[in-house]
A protein has these predicted regions:
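A short beta-loop-alpha structural element at the N-terminal edge
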Residues: 32-50, 60, 224-225
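Conserved acyl-donor/pantetheine-binding loop and adjacent beta-alpha core of acyl/acetyltransferases
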Residues: 95-135
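Active-site rim helix/loop that mediates acceptor-substrate recognition in acyltransferases
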Residues: 51-107, 231, 246-251
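Conserved active-site alpha-helix within GNAT-family acetyltransferase domains
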Residues: 160-163, 173-192
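Conserved GNAT acetyl-CoA-binding A-motif
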Residues: 130-131, 159-172, 200
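Conserved acyl-CoA
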Residues: 122-127, 150-166
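Conserved acetyl-CoA-binding loop-helix of GNAT-fold acetyltransferases
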Residues: 135-138, 143-159
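Conserved beta-strand-loop-alpha-helix junction that forms the acyl-donor binding cleft
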Residues: 155, 168-179, 197, 224-226
């Protein structure tokens, strides 16, 4: 992780400054600052160039990780007041970016969190505003500096300033590199789906702003490889959610929660020692 961030405001907008630890995988002898701040239509051309550069550096099979957009797309996107783009700069160079979209109803959220079976707006006793996070994009030469995690953390702070009640995001199920920063920021893997835009398999992630945990009193923990999709889907149907990710072993740890189901599901009383002595049969 990088050195401590310096956080300040310019024209009522958050600006975070930190130090890079490496560029192109090589440690830096002298400090090099980066800045995270909001983007504007003036950055649209840089955003299009960054999107193209990142997409062109994807390996085979990673095409579903992000969507490539032109600078014309980014000029148009700033017409929507509910979308807030942020960027990571090294000097005047844009090296990373993402966005937050404030959703006020289920229809708006479905555009960002497709095929989610959980309705965040149904039967709520308070006004619900969901901050849906877009993909985190960083130039390959600047990876390894935890910039993804800091962009997530920045947007969580922005969501709080915008009075959002929840944060959500999607991650391609094969993109284990983006799982680490979301789980580090206490997001829950609560469902899986198919992205209608490209047919990719996605994990749906959520963090309630007002709760530290949504776990039930059932203490069972089950660990599975991130790519055992059928087993993971079966666990989710039984009321389990992903709560931790082991980057080294690429394993997801699941725990039980009643938060994402309309009623409590009855769990089988048979035990299985394939995963641990207290694991429910899957």
């Amino acid at each position: 992780m990088n050195n401590a961030l310096t956080k300040y405001e310019v024209n009522n907008q958050m600006v975070w400054r930190g130090n890079l630890s490496k560029i192109d995988g090589s440690p830096l002898e002298k400090p090099v600052h980066f800045y995270i701040r909001p983007l504007s239509v003036e950055n649209a051309s840089q955003m299009g160039e960054l999107s193209e550069a990142i997409y062109n550096n994807l390996k085979e099979g990673e095409e579903c990780f992000i969507h490539k957009h032109s600078k014309e797309y980014y000029y148009d996107v700033f017409q929507n007041d509910n979308i807030h783009y942020i960027g990571v700069f090294v000097g005047s160079k844009l090296v990373g970016m993402s966005y937050l979209k404030v959703c006020h109803n289920e229809e708006e959220l479905q555009e960002e969190l497709p095929n989610s079976s959980y309705n965040f707006f149904k039967n709520s006793k308070r006004e619900v505003k969901v901050a849906s996070f877009g993909a985190d994009s960083v130039l390959p030469s600047y990876r390894g500096n935890s910039l993804n995690a800091m962009m997530i953390n920045y947007r969580m702070s922005l969501a709080s300033r915008l009075d959002c009640t929840d944060c959500t995001s999607i991650v391609d199920r094969n993109n284990r590199w983006n799982m680490t920063p979301y789980f580090a920021n206490r997001f829950n893997l609560f469902s899986t789906a198919i992205d209608p835009s490209d047919g990719g398999k996605i994990s749906l992630l959520h963090k309630p702003m007002s709760k530290d945990t949504v776990l039930s009193n059932i203490k069972t923990r089950i660990t599975l490889p991130y790519n055992r999709f059928e087993l993971i889907d079966d666990l989710i149907k039984k009321g389990f959610i992903g709560v931790e990710f082991d980057k080294k072993d690429a394993n997801v740890t699941f725990a039980h929660s009643n938060f994402y189901v309309s009623n409590i599901r009855r769990l089988p009383r048979v035990f299985d020692t394939r995963f641990n002595k207290n694991a429910f049969v899957i």
